[in-house]
């Protein structure tokens, strides 16, 4: 996998924690436009965050991604999960404060490595 791209203009605000982690974080994996990091407050034995390079506040703005970017992001989720040895896992998106989103930079949670609670 390729290293994350260097900062591109104003697409990565200085005041966004996830933009900073995209640029400077301890990445588990990286590919063009996306990185994976470990969640600092894990809710499962393995709890990773998939961060896009592009600063998009939440899943509500997913339409700003092309179909190809969205596909690459989901393929990256599967690659990272496999690399971590996960065969059974959850992919979760919190879209907005009422859903539990606390950092307003689109990100996907990948949780696995043990039962993480029942979800229908």
Model-inferred region functions:
Residues 1-120:
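HIT superfamily nucleotide-processing domains
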């Amino acid at each position: 996998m390729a290293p994350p791209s260097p900062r591109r203009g104003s697409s990565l605000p200085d005041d966004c924690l996830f933009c900073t982690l995209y640029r400077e974080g301890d990445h588990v994996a990286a590919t063009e436009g996306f990185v994976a990091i470990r969640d600092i407050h894990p809710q499962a034995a393995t709890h990773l965050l998939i961060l896009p390079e592009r600063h998009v506040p939440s899943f509500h703005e997913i339409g700003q991604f092309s179909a190809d970017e969205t596909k690459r992001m989901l393929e990256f989720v599967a690659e990272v999960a496999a690399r971590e040895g996960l065969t059974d896992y959850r992919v979760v998106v919190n879209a907005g404060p009422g859903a539990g989103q606390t950092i307003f930079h689109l990100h996907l949670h990948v949780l696995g490595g043990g039962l993480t609670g029942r979800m229908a």
